[in-house]
Amino acid sequence: LYLFGDTAAETTSNQSQVDLGWQAVEAMKLGALIVLFVLIGVANLVVVARQARRATWKELLSPSILALVFFALAGAGVVADLRGILKIASAQLSVFITPLSIAGLIWGFLVVLLWRARFFTRGTVAWNLLNILVLIVLVALGSMEPEQSIVTGDHLAVLMALGVTAFFVWFGIRQAVANDERMKAGQKPWEALYAEKVPTWPDLVYIEAICAVIVLGGLVLWGLAVKAPLEAPANPAVTPNPAKAPWYFVGLQELLVYFDASIAGTVLPLLAVIGLLVLPFLDSNPKGCGYYTLRERPVAIAVFLFGFLGLWWYLILVGMFFRGADWAFVRYSPSATEELEVAEAANTLSAIVWEKCLGISLFREADRLPRVYRYVLALGRELPGILLLGAYFLGLPWWLARNLCRQIYEKLGKGKYWFLQLLLLTMLFIPLKMLLRWLCNLSYVLALPEWRLFF
C-alpha cells in the first residue's frame, strides 16, 4: 500500500510538472506574439511617418489600419485571452481553406501579379502584402495548442524558403518593370549600364569570404536552436501516420493524390528535368537574355512562374501543412484541434461514362471471360479515356499548329514544336487533373489494371 501510494503521488507530481511546463511554454509564446505585434505595429507607424509628406491619403490608409490591427491584437494579449481570440479568427478563416481555394488563391494571384505587375511592385503594396502574410502566419501559430506550438525543422525550412522565393520573384519582376519602362522611353536596360569588366580579385573574393562566414554562422545557430527533424528508430510493428517525406520531396508525395505512383514519381519529374535541360535549345528568342524584362518574354515568365509557384510550391505547402492521418486534408476548428476531411471513393472516367451516364454495367463481368477477350473488352471500356487523351495530346497540338501557333510551328520546326507541346500540355494536365478530382471526384482518365497503366 505504501508503494502504491508513493507511486501515485509521484505520478501526480510528474503530471503537475508537465502541466507547469506547458503553461510556461504557452506564456513565453504569447509574450513573444505580443512583442511581435507591437514591433510590427511600430514599423507600420514608421512607414506612415516617412511617407506622410509625399504619399496620398489612400497610400497611408492601409499601413495605418494594419498598425491599428497589430496594436489591437497586442492589447488583447495583455487584457484578454489572446489565444482564444486567435483560435476563433483562425476557425473562421479555416472554413474557406480547401485544396481548391488554396490553388485558386495562388493561381489567381499569379495572374493578377503579371497583369498588374507595375502596381504590385510598388513598395507600399509589397509592404502591405508582407504584413498580411505575417499576420496570417502569426494567427495560425498563436491559435495552436501548447503541445503543437513547436515548429519543426522542416516547417521552418519551408517557411524560410517560401519567404526567400517570394522576395526574389517580386524583386525580379520589379527589375523587369523598371527595364520595360526604360526601353519604352528609348533607353537601355539597367544591366546594359554595368561595366564590361567586373573586378574579381580581391573584391569578389572578399565578398565570397564574408558570405561564407555568415552562412556558416547561420548554420551553427540553426543547428543549436532548431531540433533536427529526425524520426525515432524504425519499428516494424509501428507505422507512422502520416509518414511524410522531407519537405523537398513532399510535393511528389502530394502529387500521388492525383496520379499513379509511376506517373507522379517517375514520368512527371523526369519530364520536368528534361524540359529544363532542353529549354535553351527550344527557345531561340534572343530577347530577354542578360537583362530582366517582362514585356518581351511574357509567355515564358508566366509558364515558369505557374509551374514553379503555382504547381510545385502549392504541392509542398499542402503536403507539409494541410495533410494529416491517412493523407486526409486537415482543417482547424474551435471545437476540435483538427478536423480530417474524409475523401469519398473516386471514380474513373470509364465508370462515370458507362455506368453513371449510360447505365451500362457490362464491363463488370469481364473477369469471367478468357484473357484475350478481357484485354479487348478493357480497351473498349477505356475508350472514352483513350479518345480524350488522344484529342488532348495529339489533336490539340495539331489544331494549334494550323491556327494559333502557326508562326511558332514554322519557326521551331516539326520536331521541336511537338516536343515543346508535349512538355507544356503535360504540365497543364496536372492542374486539369486536380480540378477534375476536386469538382468531379475523378481518379483516373485512363485506368488499365490489366497492363498496370493508370493516367
Kindly give the residue locations of the regions a language model identified.
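Hydrophobic cores of alpha-helical transmembrane segments in multi-pass integral membrane proteins
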Residues: A27-G84, S94-M144, D154-N179, E191, ...
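Extended, regular secondary-structure scaffolds
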Residues: M183-Y194
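Inter-helical loop and helix-membrane interface segments of multi-pass membrane transporters/permeases
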Residues: E10-V18, V79-L93, P146-E147
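Short, strongly hydrophobic alpha-helical membrane anchors
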Residues: L1-E26, L141-M144, R452-F455
